[in-house]
Amino acid sequence: MIHSKPTRNLALDLVRVTEAAALAAGRFMGRGDKNAADKASVDAMRLVLNEVEMDGIIVIGEGEKDEAPMLYNGEHLGTGEPPQVDIAVDPIDGTRPLAHGQYNSLSTVALSPRGTMFNPGPFVYMNKIAVGPEARDVIDIDASVEDNLKAVARAKGMDVNDVTVVILDRPRHEKLISEVRRLGARIRLIPDGDVAGALMTSMPETGIDILMGIGGTPEGVLAACALRCLGGNMQGKIYPRNDVERQKGIELGYDLDKVLKLEDLVSSEDTFFAATGITGGELLHGVSYTGAGATTDSIVMRGLTGTVRRIMAQHRFAKLSRISAINY
């Protein structure tokens, strides 16, 4: 018989955070105003994060304090009570798709024990490779595209031409895309939102087998937290945008040649992750508004137990307005 009581699942607190941000941001779908959408989601996310019983510090936020008035790197959030945690936030992963009324924008947040989350410092981008549980032990970011695709195909009992690779649609990936095509693998190009792309590698129903390419470091850490929960794997390498960023990183002590393994990106298994869809996509449905309120679709997970929940929630604005300062 198990006598110790269950520990608290902070992921269930986090889903209220991402729901609030998604509900606030969803009003701006297709309206062409990224800044207004971002402000609405940041305001809502910060308000609800401050209600969570935790002593949190933002490691992955909206930028440095002089660049971001709220949810900035180093900001303290929560009630100040234990547990002490690192926080990674992306109120809108995919601001451009949201502003243009396109698919695959999400609101995401992750927590892990204090000092366990990788701090990317000045670096905005990293090279990434991510896979699901079946191929978790076979990837190597320093190996060739061909070697990685063949290794993933073998691990999953597939031919290379059955493998589907998700890649951000950017000019910098022209060579990568050409190589994947040469090898005969399938490609899913996404305009933004590689957090969703990384998660889909661990969800067989999406048909995605591997994520490759250069994307944001904040999204990389958030994805790593989720993959810790899902049993997948990820590797990354810092990708300086220019010589100034490279030199600054060296001065701060970063090893630019180091392969960042999943355990380097988030060193604790006791991690929590939540995401709520803003605009619809393959991972989550978007916010759907009615005359009385809205419906949200979220995924929440906990690394310690491996439990993954899907939460479809109905929100009634007339009742919410009595207890919430957020203008939905």
Task: Please state what every model-predicted region is.
Residues 1-88, 150, 154, 195-196, ...:
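N-terminal subdomain of lithium-sensitive/metallo-dependent phosphomonoesterases centered on the IMPase/IPPase/PAP
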Residues 108, 113-189, 281-288, 294-324:
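Acidic beta-strand-loop-alpha-helix segment within the catalytic core
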Residues 82-93, 97-117:
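DPxDG-like acidic metal-binding loop motif
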Residues 227-281:
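Glycine-rich phosphate/nucleotide-binding loop
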Residues 185-195, 208-210, 214-215, 219-250, ...:
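Gly/Ser/Thr-rich active-site loops/lids in small-molecule metabolic enzymes
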Residues 50-51, 76-82, 90, 98-102, ...:
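Solvent-exposed alpha-helices and their adjacent loops that cap or buttress functional pockets
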Residues 58-62, 87-89, 98-100, 119-120, ...:
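General beta-strand structural signal in soluble alpha/beta enzymes
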Residues 174-175, 197-199, 219-223, 282-283:
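Short acidic/glycine-rich loop or secondary-structure boundary segments that cap or lie
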